[in-house]
């Protein structure tokens, strides 16, 4: 009997959760759940998977009101799981998405805080509200870390820092190993929030994978609320968000002349 794709995928998702890659596990789980609804069953051999099935699955997702970004995410999750099975010689070689058009969303210009607003926010006196001070520090730490995701930020361990280098294992990126320069500004932020655990910041307190994900989500939500209050206090043109930190970092790098560095 051929190996079942759903059973194989569930095992992969369990491994993702066991290694702390909760975001990856959640995305794969959502894609698998939708595929099950489309098929009306939870059994599917690798031999039954086909380009035609993926085309029909895409049409079904579109017909059920899924956004293009969601359709693309789900199809790529199924494709990635299949490719992993290929590498393990469990599934035959098959270009599962060959010919399926998955147009990238049009790149919309993201509104960012101006440099003057960033300075105003950075040096504002927020000492009367610890939650706002913490939110600001996490916002700028994310920028200093090249726009690190909050999930990855929460998972940084003290042992990841060696001298002037931070090397961490990303929960959301592939390849997962990321190295950035560790500087005085980042150290100053870390010093303000001593952690009693192996993690750099006091965000994750549990060893349970599911509880970890909830802790991260709760702190992220509190930061989002605090950033909205900061926007009002600092008279910012837009509300700062953790999602914009990568674009702010890229803008800063793009504005630097290489000839002034080398």
Spans of model-derived segments:
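Short, contiguous acidic/charged loop-to-helix segments that flank catalytic cores in large enzymes
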Residues: 126-129, 167-177, 210-219, 237-240
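Conserved tyrosine-mediated DNA breakage-rejoining catalytic core shared by Y-recombinases
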Residues: 155-191
């Amino acid at each position: 009997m051929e190996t079942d794709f759903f059973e194989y995928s569930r095992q992969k998702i369990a491994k993702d959760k066991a290694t702390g890659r909760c975001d990856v596990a959640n995305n794969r789980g959502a894609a698998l759940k939708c595929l099950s609804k489309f098929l009306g069953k939870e059994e599917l051999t690798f031999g039954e998977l086909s380009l035609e099935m993926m085309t029909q699955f895409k049409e079904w997702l579109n017909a059920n009101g899924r956004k293009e970004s969601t359709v693309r995410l789900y199809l790529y999750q199924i494709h990635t799981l299949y490719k992993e099975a290929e590498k393990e010689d469990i599934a035959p070689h098959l270009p599962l998405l060959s010919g399926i058009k998955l147009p990238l969303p049009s790149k919309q210009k993201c509104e960012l805080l101006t440099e003057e607003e960033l300075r105003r926010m950075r040096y504002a006196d927020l000492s009367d509200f610890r939650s706002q001070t913490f939110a600001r520090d996490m916002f700028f730490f994310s920028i200093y870390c090249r726009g690190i995701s909050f999930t990855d930020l929460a998972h940084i361990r003290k042992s990841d820092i060696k001298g002037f280098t931070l090397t961490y294992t990303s929960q959301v990126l592939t390849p997962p190993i990321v190295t950035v320069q560790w500087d005085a500004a980042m150290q100053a932020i870390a010093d303000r929030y001593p952690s009693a655990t192996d993690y750099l910041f006091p965000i994750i307190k549990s060893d349970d994978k599911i509880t970890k994900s909830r802790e991260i989500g709760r702190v992220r939500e509190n930061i989002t609320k605090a950033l909205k209050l900061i926007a009002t206090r600092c008279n910012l043109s837009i509300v700062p968000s953790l999602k914009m930190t990568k674009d702010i970092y890229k803008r800063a790098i793009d504005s630097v002349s290489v000839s002034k560095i080398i």
